[in-house]
């Protein structure tokens, strides 16, 4: 049995296959996923699992150099923005319109759907290197 924190086989496989500057998306239950994008659906019920819990778990195994967030999170969900910043205080943030973030999911290795039910709880993680 795997000893590390991420025990979901699909998530673990995606992370293991990522290289420098590859993208992984994590988001709320309502985020539309483009056709052809691998979707790992973890949603069980309203807010379970939460966006932040899934993000924390992924960050235990993925080196992140940059994140992409919707501009709208600044005014529509500032609490979530603050929680993200606390998890990654030294990671560059690029804000883009929500409509662009949705389109950019087509460039991700996968999108992890959570049960989160708060607006604009979506992120694209850009992988870094560990050396």
UniProtKB/Swiss-Prot annotation:
- Coarse class of the protein's main subcellular location: cytoplasm
- The EC class name is isomerase
- Where does this protein hold substrate? 28, 98, 120-122
Q: Which reaction does it catalyse?
A: beta-D-ribopyranose = beta-D-ribofuranose
Alphabetically sorted, this entry's keywords are: Carbohydrate metabolism, Cytoplasm, Isomerase
Per the entry, what this protein does is: Catalyzes the interconversion of beta-pyran and beta-furan forms of D-ribose.
Q: Provide the E.C. number(s) assigned to this enzyme.
A: 5.4.99.62
The UniProt family comment states: Belongs to the RbsD / FucU family. RbsD subfamily.
Please indicate which superkingdom the organism of origin belongs to.
Bacteria
What subcellular compartments does it reside in?
Cytoplasm
Indicate what this protein is called per its UniProt record: D-ribose pyranase
Under the heading NCBIfam families, the entry gives: PRK11797.1
> Which pathway is it part of?
Carbohydrate metabolism; D-ribose degradation; D-ribose 5-phosphate from beta-D-ribopyranose: step 1/2
Which residues constitute the catalytic centre? 20
Tell me one GO biological process term.
D-ribose catabolic process
Encoded by which gene? rbsD
What is one GO cellular-component annotation here?
cytosol
